[in-house]
Amino acid sequence: MAQRTGLEDPERYLFVDRAVIYNPATQADWTAKKLVWIPSERHGFEAASIKEERGDEVMVELAENGKKAMVNKDDIQKMNPPKFSKVEDMAELTCLNEASVLHNLKDRYYSGLIYTYSGLFCVVINPYKNLPIYSENIIEMYRGKKRHEMPPHIYAISESAYRCMLQDREDQSILCTGESGAGKTENTKKVIQYLAHVASSHKGRKDHNIPGELERQLLQANPILESFGNAKTVKNDNSSRFGKFIRINFDVTGYIVGANIETYLLEKSRAVRQAKDERTFHIFYQLLSGAGEHLKSDLLLEGFNNYRFLSNGYIPIPGQQDKDNFQETMEAMHIMGFSHEEILSMLKVVSSVLQFGNISFKKERNTDQASMPENTVAQKLCHLLGMNVMEFTRAILTPRIKVGRDYVQKAQTKEQADFAVEALAKATYERLFRWLVHRINKALDRTKRQGASFIGILDIAGFEIFELNSFEQLCINYTNEKLQQLFNHTMFILEQEEYQREGIEWNFIDFGLDLQPCIDLIERPANPPGVLALLDEECWFPKATDKTFVEKLVQEQGSHSKFQKPRQLKDKADFCIIHYAGKVDYKADEWLMKNMDPLNDNVATLLHQSSDRFVAELWKDVDRIVGLDQVTGMTETAFGSAYKTKKGMFRTVGQLYKESLTKLMATLRNTNPNFVRCIIPNHEKRAGKLDPHLVLDQLRCNGVLEGIRICRQGFPNRIVFQEFRQRYEILTPNAIPKGFMDGKQACERMIRALELDPNLYRIGQSKIFFRAGVLAHLEEERDLKITDIIIFFQAVCRGYLARKAFAKKQQQLSALKVLQRNCAAYLKLRHWQWWRVFTKVKPLLQVTRQEEELQAKDEELLKVKEKQTKVEGELEEMERKHQQLLEEKNILAEQLQAETELFAEAEEMRARLAAKKQELEEILHDLESRVEEEEERNQILQNEKKKMQAHIQDLEEQLDEEEGARQKLQLEKVTAEAKIKKMEEEVLLLEDQNSKFIKEKKLMEDRIAECSSQLAEEEEKAKNLAKIRNKQEVMISDLEERLKKEEKTRQELEKAKRKLDGETTDLQDQIAELQAQVDELKVQLTKKEEELQGALARGDDETLHKNNALKVARELQAQIAELQEDFESEKASRNKAEKQKRDLSEELEALKTELEDTLDTTAAQQELRTKREQEVAELKKALEDETKNHEAQIQDMRQRHATALEELSEQLEQAKRFKANLEKNKQGLETDNKELACEVKVLQQVKAESEHKRKKLDAQVQELHAKVSEGDRLRVELAEKANKLQNELDNVSTLLEEAEKKGIKFAKDAAGLESQLQDTQELLQEETRQKLNLSSRIRQLEEEKNSLQEQQEEEEEARKNLEKQVLALQSQLADTKKKVDDDLGTIESLEEAKKKLLKDVEALSQRLEEKVLAYDKLEKTKNRLQQELDDLTVDLDHQRQIVSNLEKKQKKFDQLLAEEKGISARYAEERDRAEAEAREKETKALSLARALEEALEAKEEFERQNKQLRADMEDLMSSKDDVGKNVHELEKSKRALEQQVEEMRTQLEELEDELQATEDAKLRLEVNMQAMKAQFERDLQTRDEQNEEKKRLLLKQVRELEAELEDERKQRALAVASKKKMEIDLKDLEAQIEAANKARDEVIKQLRKLQAQMKDYQRELEEARASRDEIFAQSKESEKKLKSLEAEILQLQEELASSERARRHAEQERDELADEIANSASGKSALLDEKRRLEARIAQLEEELEEEQSNMELLNDRFRKTTLQVDTLNTELAAERSAAQKSDNARQQLERQNKELKAKLQELEGAVKSKFKATISALEAKIGQLEEQLEQEAKERAAANKLVRRTEKKLKEIFMQVEDERRHADQYKEQMEKANARMKQLKRQLEEAEEEATRANASRRKLQRELDDATEANEGLSREVSTLKNRLRRGGPISFSSSRSGRRQLHIEGASLELSDDDTESKTSDVNDTQPPQSE
């Protein structure tokens, strides 16, 4: 801040006297005493000096009284140097700690400086007195200033928010937070005052009659709201008892357009009772004190002590008068627009609230019923509110309540009546306050839609801690908790998240300031519920009380960290909450009632029906009482928009307040917050007193220290790349190369050029971040740069003005000398006799000469008149012919328009065909989906088949059980052993088969690999697929045969037959459905034919792009025609005829080409139509073939099913026979079954497991069948999709070729038009150049002759000045060399100091490590040392920055020194040259003086002759031989044009409508141009305003630069003294740095002066040289021109003849061009033929595509014909590929032809341009009279250029569409790749299926062998049974042992053995032991 002396009274409270602070004595005292801060109970912290260190304790001496004390090291806090005393931003403090912050705030507060910056926000301490710092003069001081330019103030915060809103277009908010009485409301008013003054809407507006009405109303809204919403409390005389959010809306220009006020939680209970020494709302006291007698009688007012609701009577406020405040409130209402009736009605309601309190009730003797002994007060109340007294008393004492469906009268007790009256009084006052806010908003918010952005000012009740706190205090403290959480989140969380989001190096710091636990304790809805949720829950229960609420709260939240039971006031308080500002004890009396807020329905209804309209309006929403929102769709009432809640939903006060607070927080989060932290200095409301402990508590709670720390450690300043480059590129002029560069790269280059320390900045993803102060330093550098530029500009301007004045003086001096010489000569000559004779004879000679000249002129005049009449006749004839040509041109244009319409129709038809094609593709997709549905049905049939097989397996199990029952024990043993051996053999066989299958699998894999390679080759694919198909069919047939054999031996045929019958019926239904689908396809085919006809009509939509381009071309042609018509309106007939003829010929050629194109396109469309009809016929044929194939497939399926039925019937008969035999055997073997039951069970388990495995294998076999068929189907589908995609790619490629051809054509048309425009522009430029050259030459001749002598004298004086300046420069250079040597010495000393500082930093780090190892106070020591380390690193960075800046300045100084040396040498050379030139000029001066006199006389004579000759030349130019030239030319052009018109007239008769369309398009373009022009003007206006604002700011900054530079120099000199031990050495360094800085500044100033002088001398020398050269050149040119003027008359005839020859040559060249264009047209016809051939090929490809689509319908039956379709599709795909290859070759050939034609066209255009230039150069001398016309034409040419640019834009759009088509092609390629991937997946599935098939075959063979063994064993057993029976019959009774021994016979390898019983048992046990492994 600049140093100020003799400060005025207001500035004493803003600015700090830095002279006192920078006192060297205080600095030395601080250094010597080693001052620190120690804790103090009284002062918070006290200053002391360290005397002795004793381990962890330190002996200190208090600075105030000299006492000594021992203090722990951890309790000591460092003291800042004296220069930081009363610092404006506490982030600048080197030692940041609580003591330093408190000391700084205290010093500033005692000096009257109440505002202090604390990093990113502002701290304000309530002064408790009025300060003169809020006047309009102070506002003007802060207006438009940046934050660092002015001292801290609420106005600076407001200005910053206002500027950010305008620049960033982001909504702002200013949040004034703090405890009650801290000054939030006053600061809010000052913010509104500043914004109303700065953004006044009447400034710059037209209506000056109502100046600032909106601003006045905005300022007067606060007094009204304070009267009705503020009250005196113990802590604050003007405490806001409600919260408000004031939203001020601004328009785009920054003017206020309206405002809106939202209020929160009015403390309405204050209206009925107040605490001790407190007052109710101000309006009650103001009304009773300030109302007049008449008003008192109207309002029935009484004294203060007569009202019960004024609990404490009248309590005055010191320094305020209620009477005066009442008048101010009334005046504010009038300004706000309140009517007299509204004010009176409001005051009546206020009086009625007081009257409510005076109503007294009495308890009757025998009952508890209340009564009203006296109704005088009730009468007054009813009179004021417009109610009936009887009804009111009845409603209070015996209200009607609803019981069921009926209403009954209920008597009230005295307590209930008193409560009802108080509730009515509170509700009435609350509704009055809501109406007041709504009325103010209605007055302020007059323009809702104009507000572009807003600034919100939040003034809400501050944090309150009373002795006992109620529900209102809980809501207020809850709000402040949320606001503090928003502050913490914004300052600490979001700031660091942005660092991480931008990717810069940053370690996340947790400051431990999260207030969410306390907020959750209050607002959490559940798990566990918070205070508000529990309160709402208790309101639902009828028997709930405040005590039950407290009990539930303790039960739910008793363990919460922020919840405690009260300790001090255990009897009075109920619970305690730990807020961020401290512990608060709450008493829950009447909380349920306050939350529910019940009201008497009867009285509310009476108030709603009041005779007073105002009262009735207040109670309009009577349905919302008792907290029950029963109205869902309420309209806007007097209180604004109604609450829209669900019907019947219970709404408590807590819920409503929570919702409004949530909305407020959402609004604040969407704005950019600006925080103002208000601090209360003491609770006594005394000025000049500051309680340090109170302030410290508030600073800790508000997070001030943390905010300062993150501001210092972080990167608070950030700027986006583009803005940084735009603003600071002036500092690095050559760092960024020309052209486009990424913003990040540009910023990196700029940073490198600025040579900033890497620690001072970070580069993120989209922004560049700086530490505090770096951006301000860059701003200063930028201001210095701009100052240098402005100084240089001023010097140039002053030098120019001085030279101009000097030249004028020199001119006057030479004129005086000439007059003197002439007078002296005349005085000598006048008495000479011969002179007298000469003067008498000379006039006579001149008279005779004049007569001769007049005769000659008369003759010439007659000749010229004759020529003029002749030329006029020719002109009329040419104009008549020109009109004919124009008519013919119009006819041709109409014909062209009709032809283009035909072409448009053809293009639309083509578009419709394309749309039809798209529809057919959609139909194809539908058919594919139906095919998929059929596949699903087939899958269902397969599932049913599986079910049948499961039933068959069940039958087989039953059959196995019967067989097992018949088998005997011995045979089972034999068979089991045989099975084991056979299984071992089968395992070997299976291994062999497995190896074979592996080999086959490898072969299959090789074949599949071959298939994938053959897919790329496309021709060999069909053969490989056929091989794979045959092998798969063989495998499938083998599987089916084996399955049938098993089914023959296992199935129970009766059930199978029924199942198969059902299956046949299902198949027949399926065949019927397929037949129906065929019929549907036939119907769809007919629909396709109809849609194809519609598609032909829709095909024309594709020509829209071409029509647009043609329209643009026609618009350009119309512009050219208008320009030519402007030419024709002038008199220069010959030039007009020539240009018109060229334009007409070019237009005819363009019309010819367009006509041929349109004819070709119509023929092509006809051919397309015929081809479409052929395609439809082929589709019909393909459909018929498909139906035939389908019928054949159905017949084949029927035959196969018949054979299957026959085989099943045979199997059924065999099974029946077999079953009969088994039943016979069953009866004989039942007895044997009982004996063998135990062994049979074991065997049955083994059998069951094997059968279960067999079932699984059968199911796997069936799944494999399905997978194989599915794989075949998918393979076919993929092949078909590949073909389809290839066809689509071909079609897209053809479409792309057509689009490219169209683009080439449009580009040619645009190029032709551009060439025409360029030709005309070149004509204009050359003509204007000739005109300017002629005029400048004439002026130069006159000026140069006059300035010769003046320049000679100037050069002599300049030479003398140069000699003097060179001598001065040499002396100054010697001085600068000495100063440079001195600076080098100072820099070396600085480097030594830097090294010492680094050593000190290392020592400090060692000390830090030692401190960390301390045992007892680890945490405290670590934190303190961390803070010290941060401060030291900041200081070290600062020192490094200073040293780097000095090094940069030294480099710059060296560069300047080298430049000065070069400049001095250059000036020495120039001095020598100037001396030589001066000597030469002296010799030439005398001869030039003589020549000048002669030239002046000759000049006058030649000027007369020149004028005469010019007149003659102009007449000749306009008339000479025009007739003879033009007649022949026009006749020839007429014949050619008539012939062309006759040829084209028959073809161009239908083009009339196109002309009207072009005119409409022209009108639309003009309208668009006007709109764009208006928008551009508006943008220019806003940009100019911004530039003016920036210019004003720059001028202010330039004026303040010197003072700021002085401050910066002092700060840099003092910054070195950061370390105590280095103070003595650093003082010497400071002196050296100051001396070096002063010397450097002097050197820089001298160098700048020398540079400016050098540049002036250079410019003067250059001007002298240039003027000398120009004099010589002009003298020579004047001589040449004098000679050429004599020869010009003779050359006129020759030029006319040459122009005639040039015209004939131009006509010949035009004929040649016409022939060349005709040849190019023939070439174009060949191109069109090639195009037709390609279109025919495209049609053929489309036919093939439709054939492929028809093939897709053949996929319904995929079981037998999949491989056939694969073969056919592969062959078709190969054919398509070959056809596509051919079409690609043809396309490449066409492209080569196009390139050749383009080259030819370019050659033709170059030839045309060269010939046109030749004709133009021949005719250049004839265009003198058309200068004014050509200027007008230049403007029209500019318009034509705009049209050309539009055409280019449209061409770009066409190219974009082409790119879209290419993207579609890429998408098709991706689909193709996906299809290939799907093919590979199917191959893998096929391999897995083959493996499963091998496993199934092995298991099937195994089962078959087991079945054979079982049947053999069964037969053997039956034989043994028969033999045993025979023995029994023969042998008679046999003993049991013998029979047992006889039965135990084993058959092993064909031999029988007889075993004993013991052996048998042992064998049985062996068998049992060996069986379990088998079952496993």
From Swiss-Prot:
Chain intervals for the UniProt region annotation (Actin-binding): 661-683
Subunit structure: Myosin is a hexameric protein that consists of 2 heavy chain subunits (MHC), 2 alkali light chain subunits (MLC) and 2 regulatory light chain subunits (MLC-2). Interacts with PLEKHG6. Interacts with ECPAS. Interacts with LARP6. Interacts with MCC. Interacts with KIF26B. Interacts with CFAP95.
Tissue specificity statement from the Swiss-Prot or TrEMBL entry: In newborn kidney, expressed in the mesenchyme and ureteric buds.
Keyword ATP-binding attributed: yes
Compositional bias of kind Polar residues: 1967-1976
Residue positions, PTM Phosphoserine: 1145, 1935, 1937-1939, 1952, 1956, 1975
Residues that coordinate or bind ATP: 178-185
Region annotated Disordered, chain positions: 1125-1175, 1697-1718, 1874-1976
Organism from which the protein derives: Mus musculus (Mouse)
UniProt name for this protein: Myosin-10
Function of the protein: Involved with LARP6 in the stabilization of type I collagen mRNAs for CO1A1 and CO1A2. During cell spreading, plays an important role in cytoskeleton reorganization, focal contacts formation (in the central part but not the margins of spreading cells), and lamellipodial extension; this function is mechanically antagonized by MYH9. Cellular myosin that appears to play a role in cytokinesis, cell shape, and specialized functions such as secretion and capping.
Subcellular location: Cell projection, Lamellipodium
Recorded GO CC terms: axon; brush border; cell cortex; cell surface; cleavage furrow; cytoplasm; cytoplasmic side of plasma membrane; cytosol
Family note: Belongs to the TRAFAC class myosin-kinesin ATPase superfamily. Myosin family.
Record-annotated Myosin N-terminal SH3-like domain positions: 31-81
